[in-house]
């Protein structure tokens, strides 16, 4: 896409290589193919950041099974798929860092977001188990559970919802994407 081409162009330099890949993280075969391509292009994978996510908010009474399943498939199953696809590389290297994006909604819940809350709390439980399973092999698994972060996804919210959320934040403003990016850098190092 144009957006990914622009990002690749901005990040590429004489000293660094940046490449964009298109895949569907909710499909295990595509995850395995993606990992193979990255290994071919870069030789190794040191860090995995699982950040695929969607919302399809609705009250339970109005939520369709299809909307529930698609949020679980994209938000939670993708974490399993990419982690499983990278596991062999991390085990071979006896090192690796897995960073999974959850949400404060996965900890606290939120009315009208039962599917999203289930997916994000599932990420927390999955990550705890993977940390215990792979930690002895020097493979770390951490979760970031941000509160309200200003993104394209939150830009769709009404002013009243944004104001209500901001009033419950000590800084009285949403977090920025660079706040989360800096935390990823710390956890990956």
Question: Where does each model-flagged region fall?
Answer:
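Residue(s) in the substrate-gating loop at a strand-loop-helix junction
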Residues: 103
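C-terminal helical subdomain
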Residues: 143, 166-189
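Active-site loop immediately N-terminal to the catalytic Tyr-X3-Lys motif
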Residues: 61, 108-114, 136-137, 172, ...
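Alpha-helical segment proximal to the catalytic Tyr-Lys
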Residues: 88, 132-136
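Substrate-binding pocket helix/loop in short-chain dehydrogenase/reductase
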Residues: 59-60, 67-72, 154, 165
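Active-site helix of classical SDR
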Residues: 83, 119, 127
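The beta1-alpha1 cofactor-binding region of Rossmann-like NAD(H)/NADP(H)-dependent oxidoreductases
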Residues: 22-33, 65, 178-179
């Amino acid at each position: 896409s144009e957006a990914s081409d622009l990002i690749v162009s901005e990040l590429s330099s004489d000293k660094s290589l940046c490449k964009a890949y298109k895949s569907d993280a909710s499909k295990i075969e595509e995850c395995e193919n993606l990992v193979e391509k990255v290994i071919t292009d870069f030789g190794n994978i040191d860090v995995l950041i699982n950040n695929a996510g969607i919302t399809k908010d609705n009250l339970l009474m109005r939520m369709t099974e299809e909307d529930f399943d698609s949020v679980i498939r994209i938000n939670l199953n993708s974490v399993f798929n990419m982690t499983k696809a990278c596991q062999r590389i991390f085990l071979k290297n006896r090192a690796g860092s897995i960073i999974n994006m959850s949400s404060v909604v996965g900890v606290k819940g939120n009315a009208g977001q039962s599917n999203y809350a289930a997916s994000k709390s599932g990420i927390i439980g999955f990550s705890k188990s993977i940390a215990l399973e792979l930690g002895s092999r020097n493979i770390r698994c951490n979760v970031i559970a941000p509160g309200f972060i200003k993104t394209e996804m939150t830009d769709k919210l009404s002013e009243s919802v944004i104001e209500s959320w901001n009033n419950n934040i000590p800084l009285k403003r949403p977090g920025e994407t660079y706040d989360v990016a800096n935390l990823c850098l710390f956890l990956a190092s």
